[in-house]
């Protein structure tokens, strides 16, 4: 698997940060994974990306981990989107952060300025589910096909995704797509 960004923006009050980290680490363990951690502990935001294989059972684990993380963030009176914004991944969690009154106001404003719903569909208002497979770059059943090249690149020790051409340097936690 690879680190997947979907809960990396949660923020909790500093008094609860250590407990949140411990509990979230336990959540990862229950789902057979771990996370990569970095960022701004001084303001209660530790960016974390659970390592998931989105080609297999990653979407189900993503949903379960996100729900548990959201419950903890609510318990600690934190924010599911502390810094980076909401987008497709976190928009479904906006409602409980702002409450029904502001959520309705967001919808009214969106409808006034974008009555056809053409700009940023599924973001902030009338959100799609974060695990909607139709929104994934590659569907869960995506398969790659080996490409035979005319040259031997094995000495370079990199992995190339035949679908995207993206190269993953060895030792960075990547795996072939």
Residues covered by each model-derived region:
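Phosphate/diphosphate-binding loops
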Residues: 3-33, 54-82, 86-176
